[in-house]
Amino acid sequence: LTPFTHAVTEHDLMRYESVRRSPVLFQERLDKKLELRVTVVGDQVFAAEIHSADDPKQSVDWRRYPSFDLARFYASHELPFEEKHRCIRLVQELGQCFGAIDLVLHPERGYIFLEINPNGQWGWIEQFTGLPIAEAFANLLVRLSTNYSSARE
């Protein structure tokens, strides 16, 4: 067992019986132009490209072999309006005001959802892309505290 994603091997399939009653996630192996970490803060969406497809070692799970050329590996990304709206709607449907969403941009199929994390990491995105995520959080907290104070009066 590993905390990282890896391609399923014949050996893994032989061991499947030992984890048959455990939660296990399998996912289709996807061709990808790039991966995206989308951070939703309130009604703001910040998307960062992760250029994992450029390196065969990182193509399955970029977290396993972090890149040392970080300026080239991460970049901000402008999501189409409909994709931004879907991300905001998902976070709202889950009753949250924040979510870290992982997407893949497939060459033919477009944006493909992988997962959402209600407590995902975002500091590294701001550090390497300059996206103002901390500022968005600060503004959201001020807005929420103002609404809370008004409701109590």
What are these regions (language model features)?
Residues 32, 97-98:
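Residues that act as N-cap/strand-start positions at coil-to-secondary-structure junctions
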Residues 1-78:
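Phosphate-binding site of ATP-dependent enzymes
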Residues 40-42, 103-107:
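Short, low-complexity Ser/Thr-rich regulatory SLiMs
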Residues 68, 74-81, 85, 89-96, ...:
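C-terminal active-site "lid" helix and adjoining low-complexity regulatory extension at the edge
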Residues 25, 46, 99, 112-114:
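Protein kinase-like catalytic core scaffold
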